[in-house]
Design a protein with these regions (language model features):
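Intrinsic-disorder/low-complexity signal
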Residues: 1-145, 149-240
Length: 240
């Protein structure tokens, strides 16, 4: 049975059979926002324009929601040594002092499956929209911690917060990006009251202790309008 993570909870990466979880996916699944709207439709034209009848019919207006799942990797001193976030973030062009986004860590131990710009359009399909695959066996020995975080991309389509999204959850599971074998742990974002009004979320941290990897579900939410602010926050407050 999957662990339902709560804010501040720490867990060992140990499966039910006692073996360690070393190769897994960290995925985020969410739905587009559905608004009920009405439009006037003609039900009878009448005769020569007289007696024309109309009525308001309800329809679903789908609003794309672009969430971005990212992570930063730190050494034992808390210095950032690698990163994964959407290649659509071209910080080098904006001169904000951050590297451009990429989908793989330098050691290829972590891989992002790509940026989903919309969310599920027709309800929960059971698959994650954005996924970072993790292989702790291959990871650079200098990596001491990995902080995962989530942002709502700031565009004209959706200006709301996490609480307005019909469902959004993060999970760690064994399997592949297209097939979930067994869910190890899950954190439900959209159900958290602390996410009301918030657009950035520090999800959790993988970290080494005495040669073993553990996970801390952080769950700190912020009103960050840009991933730039969240990255700066992670480096300053969550790298140790």
């Amino acid at each position: 049975m999957a662990i339902r993570l709560e804010k501040g909870q720490r867990i060992n990466l140990e499966k039910n059979n006692g073996s360690k979880l070393t190769q897994f996916c960290v995925g985020c699944n969410w739905g587009a926002v559905i608004e009920k709207k009405y439009k006037e439709v003609v039900i009878s034209e009448g005769f020569l324009g007289f007696g024309r009848k109309t009525e308001n019919k309800q329809y679903d207006h789908v609003i794309d929601v672009d969430l971005d799942l990212s992570c930063l990797l730190f050494d034992v001193e808390g210095r950032p040594i690698d990163h994964i976030y959407s290649p659509l973030y071209r910080f080098g062009d904006n001169k904000v002092g951050l590297p451009n986004g990429k989908l793989d860590t330098l050691d290829r131990a972590l891989h992002h499956t790509g940026d989903d710009l919309t969310g599920d359009q027709s309800g929960d399909d059971g698959l994650d929209n954005e996924i970072i695959t993790v292989d702790l066996v291959r990871i650079n020995p200098n990596v001491n911690s990995i902080v995962f975080f989530l942002n709502i991309y700031n565009n004209d389509d959706y200006q709301g917060d996490f609480s307005s999204i019909p469902y959004a959850y993060i999970r760690m599971y064994e399997g592949t990006p297209t097939k979930v074998k067994e869910v190890f742990a899950q954190y439900d974002v959209a159900t958290k009251t602390e996410c009301v009004g918030m657009r950035g979320l520090i999800l959790g941290k993988l970290y080494r202790r005495n040669g073993e990897w553990k996970f801390n579900a952080i769950g700190d939410a912020f009103a960050d309008k840009s991933i730039v602010h969240t990255i700066a926050r992670v480096i300053k407050d969550y790298s140790h």
